[in-house]
């Protein structure tokens, strides 16, 4: 049901990522080049990023991107759920719950973190049901010179 992406999945990943980044779940789309960079990095190594394809009965139901780091704040590894996209036809059937269960089994000592648009009420409800709680942080970012903001 959840498998690591392979080189042959490039077109599928690009299709799914385009769907995700043109959905109400995100604040704004990202350049296609960023998606391509993400796929290339996931194929190069799983040190920073893991790209999973979610399948139901052999059909692509979505994808997820995980990244790993260590947090001094929690004194433990962190597994960021960078992106989780489940196609509309597959929502509400427990796929998200099963995905998080598989992540928890794979990274049992890691703190799980994610970000969500408050308007994405279905995702917010899932995350709360799974025990996620909001952090009272404001995130800031600065892009490298020449990068799109």
Q: PLM ranges: what are they?
A:
Residues 1-15:
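A short beta-loop-alpha structural element at the N-terminal edge
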Residues 5, 84-86, 116:
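Hydrophobic adenine-recognition pocket in adenosine-nucleotide-binding enzymes
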Residues 14, 18-40:
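Conserved GNAT-fold acetyl-CoA-binding loop/helix
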Residues 41-53:
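A short helix-loop-beta-strand connector motif used in the catalytic cores of GNAT acetyltransferases and
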Residues 51-53, 59-68, 80:
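Conserved beta-strand in the GNAT
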Residues 76-88:
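Conserved acetyl-CoA binding element of GNAT-fold acetyltransferases
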Residues 86, 92-105, 125-129:
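Conserved acetyl-CoA-binding loop-helix of GNAT-fold acetyltransferases
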Residues 91, 103, 108, 113-124, ...:
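Conserved beta-strand-loop-alpha-helix junction that forms the acyl-donor binding cleft
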């Amino acid at each position: 049901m959840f498998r690591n992406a392979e080189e042959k999945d490039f077109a599928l990943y690009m299709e799914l990522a385009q769907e995700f980044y043109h959905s109400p779940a995100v604040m704004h789309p990202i350049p296609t080049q960023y998606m391509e960079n993400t796929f290339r990095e996931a194929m190069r190594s799983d040190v920073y990023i893991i790209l999973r394809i979610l399948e139901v009965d052999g059909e692509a139901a979505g994808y997820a991107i995980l990244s790993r780091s260590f947090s001094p704040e929690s004194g433990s590894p962190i597994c960021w759920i960078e992106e989780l996209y489940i196609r509309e036809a597959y929502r509400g059937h427990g796929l998200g719950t099963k995905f998080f269960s598989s992540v928890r089994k794979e990274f049992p000592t890691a703190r799980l973190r994610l970000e969500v648009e408050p308007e994405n009420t279905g995702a917010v409800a899932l995350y709360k049901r799974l025990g996620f709680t909001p952090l009272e942080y404001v995130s800031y970012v600065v892009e490298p010179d020449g990068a799109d903001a």
